[in-house]
Amino acid sequence: MSEMTPREIVSELDQHIIGQADAKRAVAIALRNRWRRMQLQEPLRHEVTPKNILMIGPTGVGKTEIARRLAKLANAPFIKVEATKFTEVGYVGKEVDSIIRDLTDSAMKLVRQQEIAKNRARAEDAAEERILDALLPPAKNQWGEVESHDSHSSTRQAFRKKLREGQLDDKEIEIDVSAGVSMGVEIMAPPGMEEMTNQLQSLFQNLGSDKTKKRKMKIKDGLKALIDDEAAKLINPEELKQKAIDAVEQNGIVFIDEIDKICKKGEYSGADVSREGVQRDLLPLVEGSTVSTKHGMVKTDHILFIASGAFQVARPSDLIPELQGRLPIRVELTALSAADFERILTEPHASLTEQYKALMATEGVNIAFTTDAVKKIAEAAFCVNEKTENIGARRLHTVMERLMDKISFSASDMNGQTVNIDAAYVADALGEVVENEDLSRFIL
């Protein structure tokens, strides 16, 4: 798991997300508390439970982006789900328990990658020997027994040197590699029977897992395939499962987006298949329960839950009281101003202006944005948000696409040219659409 300090986490998030200091601080503290808890001795460690977070803010201000960036920083099992995808137990649709199953699958993948990285040096040595065996098949004596490699020692060392220097990369050889194919059977699970179908799926996948087949490939590609093959052999599947389950139970993070969409409105009456019933199903997960997965039983007591929602129609108080109590840390994200839009266009690590410059550079076209142009684009996006629906920073994508439309279409015929985008260019491309409310409603 990540050992970054809260200050380092906030600094990393600042490279991608403008503003929202409170949300960044809350997430950074929660992530650091995961590490702090793991430093405690066992009796006390078990008693320290995570403080779940509820992020509240209008659409397009950075809630989902914080989740995306957090997933990369966490170095722990992480999953982001949409609350609207789930239905109450007994109805057609996904049940909330599948969140933990998916989180465990994510942990298996993460732990497998870590184990492969740990065993990579040994796997590379073994793969190298297999390549050399294919290049220099060991001699057999008169009884058909394979002799040791010593008789080929000097030749073998010469080939090893060439292999390491890349001189043999394009030579084709025939090697035995794992077939790496499953039976291709996909089983759809009826509600409540996911565990049985998971076991059947595993059974079919295991049927072809031990097979090997001869493949002809270049040494460069064959070496990669054999390294993966050898690394997989060095991993103990049972140990892998246990490590993955431990990682989920101790360090797992679940991000639930659009939680406001499962609030029951006061005036609403009728079946709430995907509303209050889902909240009640979420309760046991958030407060701690045991979920059965195909890898084993997983306890959710110490999994960190971060929920977010725009809460434009509903309010946080419309969540059922029990769920409100399980999300003790409330963070409000503020709406973005024109100045924020200006910073979003230039400051982040891969800002929109940098993306368009890089895309056009592939066609040999050099794009330059003036400071006035950036300010004008930000004002245009802010103005359209004010006049129509406020979709936050997402409006910048629409405005930029409209602005770059002519250049993007003609770029292949403009090789070697430089295009300076200034305030006049922006006004010409966006002026009419921004000023006419009817046009901006349908075009931007």
From Swiss-Prot:
InterPro entries, per this entry? AAA+_ATPase, ATP-dep_Clp_protease_ClpX, ATPase_AAA_core, Clp_ATPase_C, HslU, P-loop_NTPase
Which positions in this protein are listed as binding ATP?
Answer: I18, G60, V61, G62, K63, T64, E65, D257, E322, R394
List the residue ranges of the region (Disordered).
Answer: 143-163
Give UniProt keywords alphabetically: ATP-binding, Chaperone, Cytoplasm, Nucleotide-binding
The listed locations are: Cytoplasm
List the cysteine pairs that form cystine: none
Role of this protein: ATPase subunit of a proteasome-like degradation complex; this subunit has chaperone activity. The binding of ATP and its subsequent hydrolysis by HslU are essential for unfolding of protein substrates subsequently hydrolyzed by HslV. HslU recognizes the N-terminal part of its protein substrates and unfolds these before they are guided to HslV for hydrolysis.
What does the record note on quaternary structure?
Answer: A double ring-shaped homohexamer of HslV is capped on each side by a ring-shaped HslU homohexamer. The assembly of the HslU/HslV complex is dependent on binding of ATP.
Protein name, per record = ATP-dependent protease ATPase subunit HslU
From what organism does this protein derive? Haemophilus influenzae (strain PittEE)
Species lineage: Bacteria, Pseudomonadati, Pseudomonadota, Gammaproteobacteria, Pasteurellales
